[in-house]
Amino acid sequence: MLVTTTENIVGRTVLEVKGQVFGVVVRSRGVGGNFVASLRTIFGGEIKEYSSMIEEARRHAIDRMVVNATAMGANAIVMMRFDGSEIGQIMSEVVAYGTAVVIDKP
């Protein structure tokens, strides 16, 4: 499935708008991961434990969004965006969202 952050796809025509679509993932590093990450904050720099967790969560959110768009009968997603928030102090929510559409075949 084609997923793009743009409104239009060059050379393709949107035939039908299916509607909004999203994928949600909530992750927690766990006590051990949080402890290691908190030690890294003392010295500064990138907290790789959280970077890799968020990167993986984004990939999974996109995968879930694609599954939902496919169930709606779409073959593309336009205007894809990410949103994220913290739930409590130990969990992160990542949402991938966009507009599910049917585009013409090349």
Predicted regions and their residues:
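Gly/Ser/Thr-rich beta-alpha loop segments that engage phosphate groups in nucleotides
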Residues: E46-I47, E86, A100
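Short, well-ordered alpha-helical segments
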Residues: V21, V26, N34-R81
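Short, solvent-exposed loop/turn elements at beta->coil junctions and helix N-caps
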Residues: T6-I9, F82-I87
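N-terminal presequence-like segments and the immediate start of the first folded domain
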Residues: M1-G33, A71-M72, S92-P106
